[in-house]
Amino acid sequence: LDYLTANVSYNATYRWDRGATIDGTKLGNTIANQATWNADGRINFETLYNKVPIMRDVTKRFANTRPSNAPPKRARKFERTYRLSPDSSLVIKHNLRNKKVKVTAAKTDGTPVPVRFKAVDQNSVEILTRSDQNLKFTIVEILKEERSLARDIGEYALRFVLSPRVSVRYRNTRSLSLPLFQPNIGNIFGQTHSAGPMAPGLDFAFGFTDQSYVNRALERGWLITDDGQTSPAVWSRGNELNIEVNLELFKGFKVQLTFNRTDNRNSQMQFMYADMPTTYSGSYTKTHCALFTALRSPKADNGYYSKAFADFLGNIPEIRRRVEAQYAGTDYPSTGFLAGSPHAGQPFNPEVGTVGETSSDVLIPAFIAAYTNTPAHKQYLTPFPDFSAVLPNWRITYDGFINLGNMRDIFKTFTITHAYQCTYSVGSYTSYLNWAQADGNLGFTLDELTGMPVPTSPFNISSVAITERFAPLFGVNVTLKNELQLNAEYRDQRTITLNSAAGQVVEAAQKGITLGLGYKIVGFNTVLKMKGSQQGVSNDLTLNADVSFQHNQALIRRIETNYTQPTSGTNTFNINFSASYILSKRLTVAAYFDHQVNSPIVTTSSYPTSSTSYGLSFNLSLAR
C-alpha cells in the first residue's frame, strides 16, 4: 500500500468554571467541552498503476527527464547483394539482433526495386519476392518504434488516468457549553461522585455528547432550572471536507482541482423552561461554478440588461410550484403556535397560506439556478446542499513552451497560468422562533398579517452570495536570458449577493489588466566601476515597474420592479515604479513612485481624483 498514506487524530478538551454566589443565590458552574476529529489521506495513482507493466511503460515515456547530452544512437545496417530465385523465397541472415528492421533493395545500376519481406527472428528476414535477378539489399534496424495517432491518443488518455494525486482532508468539530451546572469538580478526570454517578461523566470529558446530554443532566438534577436565570446551553458543530486533485496530462501541463464544503451549525436551548425552546444559527460555504454566466459586462445603453437576472425572475414561478408541491399530503402540526388551532392535524391547504414568491425558500434556488445556468426543474431546493453538489475550482499552469524549438536560447522561464475560484455561501442565518415542524425541514410559521400558518423551512436566511474570481483569466510570466522579468495578467471577478429580505440582487464586478517589468543588476558597483564594495556583499540594484488598469462597477437589481440602478463605478489607472539598492550588509536604500488616476463611471457617487506619491526609504538591519 505504498501508494496510500493516511492519518487520523482525535483531540478533546474539558473545561469547568466555578460560578459565583450573589446574595446567597448560586449562579451555577459552567462546563464546556470540545472535540475535534482530523483525518487526511493521499492517493498516488501513478505509484498504484506502476505495478502494471503496460502502465509502467507509459509512465516512463512521459517521465520528466532532461534530454541527454550523449550523441544519438546510430542505427546499424547490413548490406549485401543476393540473387533472387523464381521458385523459392530467400532468407537473409543480417545479425542485427533486432526483429524490427527496414528492408530496401536496388538493382546494380541503383534503381530501387520494391520487395516484400517478413522477419524470421531477431537476426534473419525472409524475402518473399521471387524473380531472377541480382539485387543489393540494405537492412536497417528500427531504433524507435513507429507510432500511430490512435496509439498516441490512447497513451495520453492512459497518462491522464495515471497522473492524479488525490489529497483528502476532513475535519469535524463538536462543542457544548452548559451553564447552571451544580456539581463541583472532582479529582479524577474532573468527575465528582457527590451528585450520584460521575458528574458530568466521562462522555462529556472526552467530547462524546449531543443534545440529549442536557435531558440526562436535567433528569439527574445537575442543572439549576430557575427561570430567573436564562443562560442557554450552546452547541456548535462543524464539518469541513476538502479534496485536492493534481493532474499532469503531459509534461509541463499541470491542473489542480479543489473541492470544498464547510457547514457550521449552532444551537441554543433555554432548558430552564418547560418546552425548552431552541434556536438555530450557522453558516455554509461550498466551492461552486458559475462559469456559464461569467465574463459579462452590463452596459448603460441597454439598461444594464443581464440574461442571468432575467432567468432568475423567470425561474421564480417554477421553483415556487416545486417548493409547494413538497407539502402535498402533509398535515399541519399540533404543536407550537398551532396547538389548539382549527388547522392542527388537518391536511395542508394552499388557500389558508401558500408559499410566497418572495420567500427565501423560493428565491435562493431560483438565484442559484439562474447564475449557474441550471434549468429550474433540475435545481436542488435546499440552501445547504450535500457534497454531491460541490463543483470544482481549478488552477492550470503550463511551462512547456521553454522546450519548443530554440526557446531555451531566449528564455530562462516561460509560464502561462489560469485560475478559477468560485464559492456559494450563506453568510449567516437564524431559525424562526415560532416555527412548527411538520416533517423534516418542512414546517409552518405564523403570518403576522393574516394570522394564518404559511409553509416555510425552519431557517430565516437573509442573504446568500456567489463569489467568482478569474485569478487570473490569463497570465504570462517570463524571464529572459539576461534576467529581465516580464509579466502580464488579466483578472476578472464578481460578487453577486441575493438579499431576500430587501428583495434585491447586488452585483459588484471588478476587472483589470496588469503589465509588469523587473530587472536585477547584480553587483551594480562593478558595473559602474565604483570602488569600496564590501567583501561578501553583492551591491545589487533591483528595479520594478507596473502599469495597471482596473474597472469597478456595482449595480442593484430590484426583484419586484425588474429595475437596475448603478450605485458606484470607477476606472482606475495606476503606474508604480520602485528601486532597491543594497549599500552594505546592514543598509538598503529604496525609492518608489506611484501615480493613480480615478475616473468615476457614476458621477453622482464620486468625482475624478488623481494622486501621486514618491519617496525614499532606508532599511538598517541591526541583527548580527
Model-found features: residue ranges?
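Exposed, low-structure sequence patches enriched in small/polar residues
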Residues: L1-L128, N134-R624
